[in-house]
Amino acid sequence: MLKIGSHVGMSGKEAFFGSAKEAHSYDANTFMVYTGAPQNTRRKDISDLRLEEGFEFMKQHGISDIVIHAPYIINLGNSVNLDTYSLAVDFLAKEMERTKAFRSKYLVLHPGAHVGAGVDAGIKQIVQGLNEVLTRDTDLYIALETMAGKGSEIGRNFEELARIYDGVKYNDRLRVCFDTCHTNDAGYDVVNDFDGVIEQFDKLIGKEQIAVFHINDSKNDRGASKDRHENIGFGTLGFDAISYIVHHSDFIEVPKILETPYVSLPNEKEKSLPPYRYEIEMLRNSVFDPQILEKIQNNR
């Protein structure tokens, strides 16, 4: 069965219970959430997040295999500022514990950035950090995200991810989150030759290592290294290419998570609406609706 959902929020009094309800409102059967704000280390206590109510709601509505995303501030690749690196390692370990509390198997992580020290130094530092947090007994997977190649990001190509795998002692606890926008922006031809791209990935890492897909169109041409997401069917990837990926027989059981932009209202630019219910429906049915953005704006 196709597993498809989106990023959802987690805030206010309903907390995770509200996250599950938001996912259900999009007719999703999976979703992704941050355990707190992605830009900082402030976190509510697990006991305040209404997890059990969320789990019960998920059970009642056929939602499973949720994904946790690590915050952006974790940069394991920083060998220039070791205080930043130490913070990243410590906070990643805490996020792993929170991921288990959310009953998720997958913690998606941006591998890191070398901040000018060079790719080799960045990869060495990432490997060191992962070796500090992963043990024989780790009972979840860290899913390294494919990156667009913006700035000094590590993970802009499969070779860099493979080098991380090669250096990590307990790399059976690693997986990959394949982002369609990022791989396009990094230079891979996921539009015309997705199977060829996967063949490259399979030779270097193994396609069975892909545990999560981030499903996004892109505002950029292939190889732009910019990482700007677009709504499904309105970017340079196009609906047909994305639908092909979503329904690919090799990955039908892998959770597909939408991270596409909210849709702005024409006369109220400060307000925007989530597109996920509409995009999920389009992708489930494999039928593109070119009027979908207008429908989102009119059905608020």
UniProtKB/Swiss-Prot annotation:
InterPro entries: AP_endonuc_2, AP_endonuc_F2_Zn_BS, Xyl_isomerase-like_sf, Xyl_isomerase-like_TIM-brl. Belongs to the AP endonuclease 2 family. The keyword Secreted does not apply. The keyword Transcription does not apply. This is Probable endonuclease 4. It comes from Lachnoclostridium phytofermentans (strain ATCC 700394 / DSM 18823 / ISDg) (Clostridium phytofermentans). Disulfide bonds: none annotated. HAMAP family: Nfo. PANTHER family: APURINIC-APYRIMIDINIC ENDONUCLEASE (PTHR21445:SF0), ENDONUCLEASE IV ENDODEOXYRIBONUCLEASE IV (PTHR21445). Its cofactor is Zn(2+). Endonuclease IV plays a role in DNA repair. It cleaves phosphodiester bonds at apurinic or apyrimidinic (AP) sites, generating a 3'-hydroxyl group and a 5'-terminal sugar phosphate. GO terms for molecular function: deoxyribonuclease IV (phage-T4-induced) activity; DNA binding; DNA-(apurinic or apyrimidinic site) endonuclease activity; phosphoric diester hydrolase activity; zinc ion binding. Zn(2+) 1 binds at H69, H110, E145. Zn(2+) 3 binds at H182, D227, H229. Zn(2+) 2 binds at E145, D179, H214, E259. Its EC number is 3.1.21.2.
